[in-house]
Amino acid sequence: WKKEAYYDLMNKLKVAPGQRISRMSNGQRSQVALGLILAQNPELLILDDFSLGLDPGYRRLFVDYLRDYARSENKTVFLTSHIIQDMERLIDDCIIMDYGSILIQQPIETLMKGLRKYTCTVPEGYQPQLPVTCYHPAVIRQTLETYSFLPPSDVEGLLKENQVPFTGLQHENVGLEDAFIGLTGKY
């Protein structure tokens, strides 16, 4: 038992030691429960949608606290979340799943440096047929959008090879949320 972890988090949340749980918001109650879990000093911490019900301020505070705790205490944290932007600041390794299948498993740094979003202009009504190395190609108002780990010159070559009538190919690195959408599809 490591009570300091609990009291440190409660202090950051400004929760008084004698404050009744019945008078706390749902977010504060969740944080108290998470503080109690941290106080147990587990080697492996499993959190499923840990930020559910937390307002943005509490969520950010807890993400920062959890990141610092895991690093300073050398703990392993396995977590899931539907708030993807929290994960980008928190994780070292990433697994993106879609309908029970693992699409990608790699260090977050590798994913963020490698995946790019590509856009270009195509004629009205054009429907792309691209190889699987270009994820979820879609056209919205004459803009073809796809994601790929390939470098820009290779994507340009694929577009030409597949006789895509395009102009103005552009690319940008993406954040984790865009990476998730790019790999799983928009909807």
Where are the regions a protein language model picked out?
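ABC transporter nucleotide-binding domains
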Residues: 1-85, 89-92, 98, 103
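Short, surface-exposed beta-strand/loop "edge" segments at domain boundaries and coil↔beta transitions
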Residues: 45-50, 125-128, 153-156
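Generic alpha-helical secondary structure signal
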Residues: 4-8, 60, 109, 150-153, ...
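C-terminal coupling/interaction segments
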Residues: 143, 147-187
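ABC transporter nucleotide-binding domain
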Residues: 61-150, 170
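Conserved protein kinase catalytic domain
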Residues: 10, 63, 112, 180-181
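Solvent-exposed, flexible loop/coil residues
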Residues: 25, 56, 112-115, 178-180
